[in-house]
Amino acid sequence: MPAVKVKENEPFDVALRRFKRSCEKAGVLAEVRSREFYEKPTAERKRKAAAAVKRHAKKVQREQRRAVRLY
């Protein structure tokens, strides 16, 4: 859990902004969303496999585009 120490004479808004940023970096909100409902292990594997395929396709497309620009 991210913690932020409020500095002396620091406005509340600035401290809140720092806390939100640290929560975002730690992935707290994403973790809460993923644990909001139970997901069957097979559904989780299927989702992760689909994400991997999508990432790979995106990587290949980026590499092909980069190769075209070199000529």
From Swiss-Prot:
Residues 50-59 have a biased composition (Basic residues). InterPro entries: Ribosomal_bS21, Ribosomal_bS21_CS, Ribosomal_bS21_sf. PROSITE patterns: RIBOSOMAL_S21 (PS01181). GO terms for cellular component: ribonucleoprotein complex; ribosome. Belongs to the bacterial ribosomal protein bS21 family. Keywords: Ribonucleoprotein, Ribosomal protein. This is Small ribosomal subunit protein bS21. The keyword Iron does not apply.
